[in-house]
Amino acid sequence: MHRRNFIKNSSIASAGFAILPSGTLFANNKIVKVGVIGTGLRGQDHLELLLKRKDTEIVAICDVDEGMLLMAKKLFIDAKKPLPTIITGSNVAYEDLLKIAAIEAVIIATPWEWHAPMCIAALEAGKYVGTEVVLGTTLQQHWDVVQAAEHYKGHVMMLENVCYRRDVMAILNMVRQGMFGELIHLQGGYQHDLRGVKFNDGKTPYDSGVEFGAKGYSEAKWRTNHSMLRNGDLYPTHGIGPIAHFININKGNRFLNICSFASKAKGLHQYVVKKGGNTHPNAAVDFKLGDVVTTSINTANGETILLQHDTNLPRPYSLGFRVQGTNGLWMDINNSLHIEGVTEKHRWDKAQSFLDKYDHPLWKKYSNDAEGAGHGGMDFFVVNAFIESVKRKINTPMDVYDAATWSAITPLSEQSIQLGNQTIEFPDFTKGKWMYNTPIFALGDDY
């Protein structure tokens, strides 16, 4: 069955099929043959990591941007590695990459609107799929990817690197050891001034002008269009991924309801006017994305979650994590925590000594390997987990149900805002399997 007909015609008779559980096959010496779809700046990060590994061979790369392909080729030359097959020419050129039988796994690092169709095509081709966030742009796309993974018995891992951030993993270790007691409330989000990413001069990627779309470069070429046309939490997974692990979402717990609010939208217009002047054509653009989008979620086990998306205003970077339980809490903004009976009453304590004490076994084992990898080492861990899963032919530690659940917050938040901040029932992508699944993420120091 061709994927173009799959979504339309299939009734997904295998809707009850469970993604294959982790196995025991260990293949340390195996060389994984990889294809990379999307060689923009993020795709190049993945290429650099893969080129440093002894257990991967990059067979082919694909992009429609000749300039980005040239930059990607230089990475191979600098690493003294053979050049891969280079595939380009059209928006569907990736289909030719997927026809290469030798490729076992693909990494997708393209604009968001391409993630879902590329995931489905890769699943049909029998490849392991590692996709950059987000999974899709519509709720139906999320269901389509889940159903394709079930139908083709495939694996999709969202490459959410913040799940591997060192402090986040130490807190996960503390949560699992009961240091915070029973968890009650969690917060997180994406709070990052992206104005200099959403606009540039069309030649350099950051802080260089006020162009976007056809006149933009790199992310400004496509990402800003979402801020112009959509209003919701467009990038929820950096916050919700770690939170989901803290409270075992899809592994004995699930999201029940979601409600979102958006502030007025002023930041992007003001940025354009300040840098480009009132007469610049982009000063007349009506950006739909609220400057601060706030989302509330409740869960089957009774926790509450608060997410914030804040990318249009001047601010320092912070994901705004808060993990609060019956024994105390941690907040990342001031790197502080309070644990009843351990820290001084009614006072914050610096978190670092606790983070050191409860450093996750993965970081203890691989910190030297992660040194120099992107985003403070997080990128090493997320790519390593994906490649190790392919080598062992097992399910990935963050699976297609996780990808869909975390990423679906975007279209659900849009829907809630469009309906006047209505509370919406959260879909169960696992179709009840969440009640029987158990945690598999980062249980030891393996991967």
Predicted features, each with a name:
Residues 295-301, 325:
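Active-site beta-strand termini and strand-to-loop segments that position acidic
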Residues 284-297:
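Short N-terminal edge-element motif at the start of the domain
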Residues 72-74, 169-171, 196-202, 269-273, ...:
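Short aromatic-enriched loop/helix-cap "lid" or pocket-rim segments at secondary-structure transitions
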Residues 38, 42, 152-155, 162-286:
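Predominantly a Rossmann-like dinucleotide-binding segment in NAD(P)-dependent oxidoreductases
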Residues 10-13, 45, 244, 259, ...:
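C-terminal helical cap and adjacent loop that interface with cofactors, partners, or active-site loops
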Residues 1-131, 143, 147-155:
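N-terminal glycine-/serine-/threonine-rich beta1-alpha1-beta2 phosphate-ribose binding loop
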